[in-house]
Structure formats: C-alpha cells, structure tokens
C-alpha cells in the first residue's frame, strides 16, 4: 500500500505540459479528391477539306483569320491550289499541336489524325474537357500505393514505371 501512495504523489507533483502562447491546434484538411475520366486516343479519319473544322471542334478554338470577307464571296478559287494550301496548314498544325498524321492515307484524300501529347508541353486546349489532366499526371508520383504492377518483361516496352509515367528504362 505504501508503494501505491508514493506513485500517486509523484504523479501529482509532475508539472503539466502547457502549450506555448502562440501555439494553435491544427486541423487536418481533407484530401483533394479528383475524378478524372481518361479516354483512349481515337483515330479520326476525315478528308482534307473537313480537317480544320474537326481540329477546331476538338481543341475548342475558332478560326479567326480565315473567314471569307464579304467582297471575296463571288470569287472562285482553284480547288487544286486550295488543297495544297490545306496540305501545308495540316503539316504546320502537326508540328504545333502534337498531331500525328499518317502520310499513306494523306495522298488518297483522307487524313488519319491521332493526338500524341508531349509530356513536357501543355495540351494546347485539346484536353480542356478533362480538367487539369497535365497536373494530375505530374502528381501521380505523390501516390506510391497506386495499383500498378511492374513486370520487367512488360515494363521494358511500357512507359509506366514505378507509379509514374516516365521514359522506358532497361533493367539489368
């Protein structure tokens, strides 16, 4: 009984730990939850005449500098020269917006167009409907427990390594 009495007295004599005057209790913020729908790339086949319209619909950008002026409505254009002009515009768009065009079908009057986004560049408005996809992919490294499996045989051909989208590495 004496032992119990001494321990109680020791506990009472210990000073209580007080908070500093300027300290505050912090509330933990809720984690940011994002639901992002990622669609697989599609190959869109179109003729050269409709290519500009399809690209504008996909990117959400309007054509401001190619509207026909009122005094040009009566003028007829040579369709062959217009086709070569469209051909140059398609290749310029290919370089600036990350579109990949198959040249085999291009000569037949059909254009096959795919979008291959570069990791370092912005999507250029192409993925506006998907939200902040660029930021989402960059933030994947913050989640080390995503359900990705890494098989060395598959990983050498894949761009998905260690829970982050990256360039392929060779395993020794």
Curated annotation (Swiss-Prot):
It is found in: Nucleus. The lineage of its organism: Eukaryota, Viridiplantae, Streptophyta, Embryophyta, Tracheophyta. A motif (VQ) lies at residues 51-60. This is VQ motif-containing protein 17. Plants over-expressing VQ17 show stunted growth phenotype. InterPro entries: VQ, VQ_8/17/18/20/21/25. It comes from the Eukaryota. Keywords: Nucleus. Residues 60-97 are annotated as: Disordered. The gene is VQ17.
């Amino acid at each position: 009984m004496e032992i119990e009495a001494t321990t109680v007295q020791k506990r009472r004599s210990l000073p209580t730990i007080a908070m500093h005057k300027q300290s505050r209790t912090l509330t933990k913020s809720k984690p940011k939850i994002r639901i992002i729908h990622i669609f697989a790339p599609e190959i869109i086949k179109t003729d050269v005449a409709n290519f500009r319209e399809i690209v504008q619909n996909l990117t959400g950008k309007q054509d401001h500098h190619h509207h026909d002026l009122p005094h040009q409505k009566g003028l007829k254009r040579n369709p062959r020269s217009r086709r070569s002009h469209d051909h140059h515009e398609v290749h310029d768009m290919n370089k600036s917006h990350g579109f990949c065009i198959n040249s085999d079908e291009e000569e037949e009057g059909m254009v096959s167009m795919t979008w291959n986004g570069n990791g370092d560049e912005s999507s250029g408005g192409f993925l506006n409907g998907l939200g902040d996809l660029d930021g989402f992919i960059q933030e994947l490294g913050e989640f080390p427990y995503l359900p990705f499996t890494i098989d060395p045989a598959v990983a050498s051909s894949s761009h998905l390594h260690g829970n982050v989208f990256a360039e392929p590495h060779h395993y020794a």
